[in-house]
Amino acid sequence: MNAAFTSKLKHAALAVIGLMLCSCTNLYYYGPAGAMGGTRYLEGYNPGDVRYSNQQNDTESWWKGDEASGAPGIVISLRQQKAYYYKGGRFVGMSILSSGDDQHRTPVGSFTIQQKDRHHQSSQYGDYVDASGQPIKQNIDRKIDPMPPGAKYDGANMFYFMRFTRGIGMHAGFLPGYAASHGCVRMPERMAANFFNNVQIGTPVDVRN
């Protein structure tokens, strides 16, 4: 992606973000999905949080990327909690998201897609399970939670994972309507799939406040 296109992409993103400021306070919730297992670290699910009592549908995300051609690019707005997808400099898709919380902020800067893994699992967050796969201890952090005797680690699912720096990437997950992750960028599954299928290793990702 040349400098002229990058500049065009950034200016277009700023214009779109400015037009959408009025919608940044809407809350969204996806899940829990039974197939996701016990852990909710990466999905941001907290069954004790009253904000989860009313489920809402995603009425903002949209996709026309399959109809466009050209080099892809992504702009992520942490303030808006939205990801903007471009092809050939054209704005052709947008997804709501949930980025890192105050203790695990999503890094800001210019990155590129470094890894794609459709069935990725976290190496740090998940559950300790027994030999049959039944949870012994859920929602664990391997860095601080010791493994019980006889248990094994089962990493949290991060489907359609698109790594753009270190352990941080975009992936499908629950969205509570605010920044709630451990640094990753969670998206509705259908939008994560759209982005995943339309990026390559090296696709630029611009993360901004």
Mark where each language-model region is:
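N-terminal pre-domains immediately preceding structured catalytic cores
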Residues: N2-N209
